[in-house]
């Protein structure tokens, strides 16, 4: 379990659906995605031949020649060492990998679990001038009554999310929030359907934020220097804790993503450029957690859309070689 927790910091879950066959010249093997949504069957003969394919019968063998046959289970792996002439099964492979390093010790020593932290600081949740804020950030009555209130009060999926036949924002002559200009270009489906609650064995909302250490190819405890979030939505208290973490190696800075409305489009460009430069300078100053905040919105300042601000800072730091 610690092995998987460690590697979940460094890579996304492999959902597939896919069956993967691989070889480096010495080792050859097959692996199935963790949901098992693709068939993968194997046959091992008595004369030391192994066939892995999506269907049985890709190669014809006399039944008396077959030593073993079966199918790869979800997330399982089958490996051949051609030098040793040995077959390694899933349990043996993963046991070796899990025991190669003290993953549990690394996690316990370095990882911070945000949901377990407590703060004596009082955090104010009230919002002044709520109606004005709703207008500034593009929230309408339909968003509030049909989406936010049902989700917040009943914890249920809003029916408002089941379809959207409104005109494209780019063709509208009405003011639109920045997010409305982006649409997924294809319909993403799973077959069979996956439910995040009933399928919680293979699904998670857990997120990690922080600086990657030595990387996935060099297992090291520096990769565990992360904050684990139980889900991507933070309360005001959790955000306050995050920006006031005082553990060794965790340094946080808050940058404002706002611009002067009087300067119009030019002011937005200037503020965005300045925000990117501040982020790069913060990295040089030793900060490894950057919080972008639009809490400074008032009569003379508007928010830089979060999608625009985050993507701009992200790519600016990558181009500068500071995003790790």
What would you call each of these model-derived segments?
Residues 299-310:
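Short glycine/threonine-rich loop-to-helix capping motif typified by GTGT followed
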């Amino acid at each position: 379990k610690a092995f998987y927790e460690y590697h979940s910091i460094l890579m996304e879950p492999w959902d597939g659906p896919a069956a993967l066959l691989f070889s480096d010249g010495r080792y050859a093997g097959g692996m199935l995605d963790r949901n098992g949504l693709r068939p993968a069957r194997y046959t091992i003969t008595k004369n030391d031949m192994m066939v892995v394919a999506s269907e049985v019968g890709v190669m014809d063998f006399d039944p008396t020649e077959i030593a073993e046959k079966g199918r790869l289970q979800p997330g399982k792996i089958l490996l051949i060492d051609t030098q040793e002439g040995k077959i390694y099964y899933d349990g043996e492979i993963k046991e070796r990998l899990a025991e190669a390093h003290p993953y549990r010790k690394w996690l316990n020593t370095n990882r911070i679990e945000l949901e377990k932290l407590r703060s004596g600081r009082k955090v104010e949740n009230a919002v002044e001038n709520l109606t004005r804020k709703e207008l500034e950030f593009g929230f309408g009555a339909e968003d509030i009554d049909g989406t936010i209130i049902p989700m917040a009060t009943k914890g249920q999926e809003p029916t408002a999310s089941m379809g959207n036949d409104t005109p494209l924002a780019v063709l509208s002559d009405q003011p639109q929030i920045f997010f409305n200009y982006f649409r997924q270009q294809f319909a993403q489906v799973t077959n069979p359907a996956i439910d995040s609650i009933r399928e919680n064995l293979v699904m998670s909302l857990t997120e990690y934020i922080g600086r990657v250490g030595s990387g996935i190819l060099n297992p090291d405890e520096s990769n565990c220097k992360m904050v684990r979030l139980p889900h991507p939505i933070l309360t005001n208290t959790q955000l306050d804790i995050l920006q006031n973490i005082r553990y060794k190696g965790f340094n946080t800075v808050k940058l404002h993503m706002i611009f002067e409305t009087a300067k119009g489009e030019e002011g937005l460009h200037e503020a965005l450029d300045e925000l990117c430069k501040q982020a790069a300078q913060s990295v040089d100053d030793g900060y490894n957690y950057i919080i972008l905040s639009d809490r400074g919105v008032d009569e003379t300042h508007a928010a830089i859309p979060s999608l625009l601000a985050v993507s701009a800072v992200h790519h600016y730091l990558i181009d500068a070689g500071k995003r790790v």
